Amino acid sequence: MMTILLVDVVDADAAILASALRVEGFDVIVAKTAKDAREVLTAQPVALTIIDLMLRTEGGANGLELARELRLGYPAMRVLLTSSYHLSERQLERADCGVSGFIPKPYDLREVVEFVRTKVSAPPSSRRLWCAEPGSGISARFPHIETLRTASADDDRRR
């Protein structure tokens, strides 16, 4: 089973994506901070890391800088960025962060799962970027995900 590390501070987004990937047979570890992500990577092998672009690290860096750090420290691992801010392939290339692709939020889970499958099975040197228009929402293939999204939104409102 392939292990995916998901680094996202938004609990609802992380829960939705992690659940969809687990249903498809991936082992998913969720980290809320760059520090937690580094600890996971030190402890076990990870095939792919997905980092929220808006992540803020302890030193004030963002998801791009964490992606650069991970690409240098773990060259065999693929790194993807995710965000509700849309980035073009050209913007990602200019950022020179070494990522293999970009997953826009909100997630089209069917597309994301297929893309992750492609990236996990591709050699690390495969640098074809994927950058799609923001997804159309929750895939009917994952009906339990809508429940997660609703429950998470309710929890957020109560805080």
How does the language model describe each region?
Residues 5, 30-48:
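Acidic, metal-coordinating helix/loop segments flanking the phosphotransfer/catalytic sites
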Residues 11-29:
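Two-component/phosphorelay signaling modules centered on CheY-like receiver
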Residues 52-54:
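Active-site residues of response regulator receiver
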Residues 122-159:
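CheY-like receiver
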Residues 39, 61-76:
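Short amphipathic alpha-helix used as the core "switch/output" element in two-component signaling
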Residues 107-117, 124, 128:
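C-terminal output helix
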Residues 66, 94-102:
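As written
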